[in-house]
């Protein structure tokens, strides 16, 4: 009985440790920090402010058509799980 319980515990630990290396979700500050760590050559991006972008005015729906279909790092790694290899592809 003790041996089988030991085997079950070891198998659970192995499964948990291998799951930690798989895909996971990166959102918000964790996503930004992870990308900064993985991609040190990337420049720091300034936070967008409303005043900075207000001068561009209203855009017609035709000019924004392609934007909806694009997938970005947030779509890939926050809304869904991703691996470090996927994150590295954004460097």
UniProtKB/Swiss-Prot annotation:
Prodomain residues: 49-69
Subunit (UniProt): Heterodimer of a B chain and an A chain linked by two disulfide bonds.
Disulphide bond pairs: 27-78, 39-91, 77-82
Alphabetized CDD domains for the sequence: IlGF_insulin_bombyxin_like
Gene3D superfamilies: Insulin-like
Cellular location(s): Secreted
GO MF annotation, one: hormone activity
Signal peptide (UniProt feature, chain positions): 1-19
Alphabetical list of Pfam families matching this protein: Insulin
Family from the record: Belongs to the insulin family.
Biological function: Brain peptide responsible for activation of prothoracic glands to produce ecdysone in insects.
Identification of the protein by name: Bombyxin B-1 homolog
GO CC term (a single one): extracellular space
Species name: Samia cynthia (Ailanthus silkmoth)
Domain of life: Eukaryota
UniProt keywords, alphabetically: Cleavage on pair of basic residues, Disulfide bond, Hormone, Secreted, Signal
The UniProt record lists the keyword ATP-binding: no
Main location: secreted
């Amino acid at each position: 009985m003790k041996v089988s319980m030991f085997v079950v515990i070891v198998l659970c630990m192995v499964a948990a440790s291998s799951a930690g290396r798989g895909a996971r979700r990166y959102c918000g500050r964790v996503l930004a920090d992870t990308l900064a760590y993985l991609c040190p050559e990337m420049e720091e991006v300034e936070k967008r402010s409303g005043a900075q972008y207000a001068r561009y005015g209203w855009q017609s729906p035709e000019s924004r058509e392609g934007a909806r279909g694009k997938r970005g790092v947030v779509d890939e790694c926050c809304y869904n799980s991703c691996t470090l290899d996927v994150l590295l592809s954004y460097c």
